[in-house]
Amino acid sequence: MRIRPHSETWLKRPPRPRVPARLRPWLTDPGSLTARIRSRCSLFSVNVLAQRLAVPHPDEAALLGLRRGELAWLREVLLVADGVPVVFARSILPRHDVRGAWILFQGLGSRPLGAALFADPRIGRKPLACACLDRRDARYHRASAAAAPRRLPLALWARRSLFGLRGRTLLVSEVFLPTILELPT
């Protein structure tokens, strides 16, 4: 089986018949996902899985204006509500921007990136896009490995958007684990 990113599957809106009704608000809310999860649990935490230079997937590189194979800063985390992983998040930043516009990206540790993004009024967000990721997608496998030992369904819904600050962009992708639906609405 060939594992690849699904550049062609990112949609402006989640298709109504395919997306579970309880998941739709999570996919479409333009506000802070961190704040939304925090408001629905007693204990919120961020489990940092990776923060390093890496080659983004081709569709991610294209969104950020990077050449194929060019290194970028990668941060992968699990958002955890009351001890249960609910979201696998992946952030990509052109490596030359980590010292400039996006200095906040350095030294985040286990602090949520979302809290920093939505606290700064200078940071703008482009519209959300969503996709149904299946086992052919590398992001599905990263989310699955991070959520182990839980078994995941054959497909996971995700959303992503670009954040802008002083002409520089940051890509944030969020893959929703089935446990997100266990949080109160």
From Swiss-Prot:
GO molecular function: chorismate lyase activity
Documented EC number(s): 4.1.3.40
Reaction(s) catalysed (UniProt annotation): chorismate = 4-hydroxybenzoate + pyruvate
Pathway participation: Cofactor biosynthesis; ubiquinone biosynthesis
Name the record gives this protein: Probable chorismate pyruvate-lyase
Organism: Aromatoleum aromaticum (strain DSM 19018 / LMG 30748 / EbN1)
Ligand binding (substrate): 75, 113, 174
Enzyme class: lyase
Compartment(s) of residence: Cytoplasm
Function: Removes the pyruvyl group from chorismate, with concomitant aromatization of the ring, to provide 4-hydroxybenzoate (4HB) for the ubiquinone pathway.
Keywords: Cytoplasm, Lyase, Pyruvate, Ubiquinone biosynthesis
Cellular compartments per GO CC: cytosol
Source species, domain of life: Bacteria
